[in-house]
């Protein structure tokens, strides 16, 4: 489910994000509350992987220091799922000691990182700080989900259909199972 920060909304509208994602775009921490539920917790729990792209220096600092003052910073703090960040910022911001320490802390906490790349930046400069290409981010997401799980290499036999148990040579007990679930 996409979450758009106030800064991100300066570049693209929530409506555009919703249209591209075919999902509701969330922008406000408190607009999620329905029937007394904690919306940010719901978002954090119903995901399999939290992907933050682009991850600004501000958001990285909030994540590294446990600051949760908006939906984008609260969700990764509230999740127990893996987090993947794709940093994007000015070269000087990327190379700043504070940013490097924040990224090191996040990586030590198990946050995965892709990028940033070297290349053209928004301020007509070139250098490290460019967000990884969307195709590379997608490849990292696919790699995450294609990791072998606890059942990798195991084989299973699935049987389906009715169960018939003989009582004697003439009578039996059976159920009306069609087997459709087993064939699905």
Model-derived regions, located:
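A cross-family phosphate/adenosyl-ligand binding-site feature
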Residues: 1-83, 91-179, 183
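G-domain G4 guanine-recognition motif of GTPases
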Residues: 88
